[in-house]
């Protein structure tokens, strides 16, 4: 597979009719050059203060952030402008944070969205940090934030299927909220294994259903109004998938029920969010009648 051709898409996409307005607005924001800005790696990933900008500069920041709506992951605070994303991604990050040490490691984030988790990971001082996501919108959101952060994070407009062909292997791979979008979950986990160095580790989360049987739910057409949800396993079924893909030391870190504290509508998001995806008369079910979203977080190590 020739990744160079695929990587050129990163630049070519900027001329697409729906993408060009984002790119042109981003270019305006990137004319603002500031150095030695204060960075806060907390729940609100923050860069700079309002006092760092003149009025015209701040207005460009506001207009750029608004042009790049919807912001699904965050929250961010850019020169004190609060971008309150649909997902409070700090909740997930704080949950998994005790389970990894990225210092001096080569790290990948598959389905990295706008890079919120990667910006938080900078505090861990990884050797190299690379995000994979084919979305032009989230690429521009990432570049907007990173223009001021000035990190060495690499953002590749590639998917998990390209991981094993990348030009080097990884010590640690995150794949959060991706597996249920893949029609071949075992094949996807095998791609992660092939992208790892020997004894490398993964940390994933995915939708789950309760039960001790080795089975999974296969939604018909949509799940929680999402069309591309293919397989939702029990924990025993997920462990089987991981073992078949070449992983050992499989550790269940946590299970959580998605709440409106974590996912909700904001002025920076889509018109619909979690409350619109659940049965209005029974929040334990989706609008389609399936069990409401529940997630399992798992860490595992490559066998060889």
UniProtKB/Swiss-Prot annotation:
GO biological process, one term: tRNA wobble uridine modification
Domain of life: Bacteria
Record's keyword terms, sorted: Transferase, tRNA processing
Reaction(s) the record says it catalyses: carboxy-S-adenosyl-L-methionine + 5-hydroxyuridine(34) in tRNA = 5-carboxymethoxyuridine(34) in tRNA + S-adenosyl-L-homocysteine + H(+)
Protein's UniProt keywords contain Transferase: yes
EC numbers: 2.5.1.-
Annotated residues for binding of carboxy-S-adenosyl-L-methionine: 73, 87, 92, 111, 133-135, 160-161, 180, 295
InterPro entries registered for this protein in UniProt: CmoB (IPR010017), Mo5U34_MeTrfas-like (IPR027555), SAM-dependent_MTases_sf (IPR029063)
Pfam families for this protein: Methyltransf_9 (PF08003)
Keyword check for Amino-acid biosynthesis: no
Function per UniProt: Catalyzes carboxymethyl transfer from carboxy-S-adenosyl-L-methionine (Cx-SAM) to 5-hydroxyuridine (ho5U) to form 5-carboxymethoxyuridine (cmo5U) at position 34 in tRNAs.
Similarity-based family: Belongs to the class I-like SAM-binding methyltransferase superfamily. CmoB family.
PANTHER family per record: TRANS-ACONITATE 2-METHYLTRANSFERASE-RELATED (PTHR43861)
Record's protein name: tRNA U34 carboxymethyltransferase
Organism annotation: Aliarcobacter butzleri (strain RM4018) (Arcobacter butzleri)
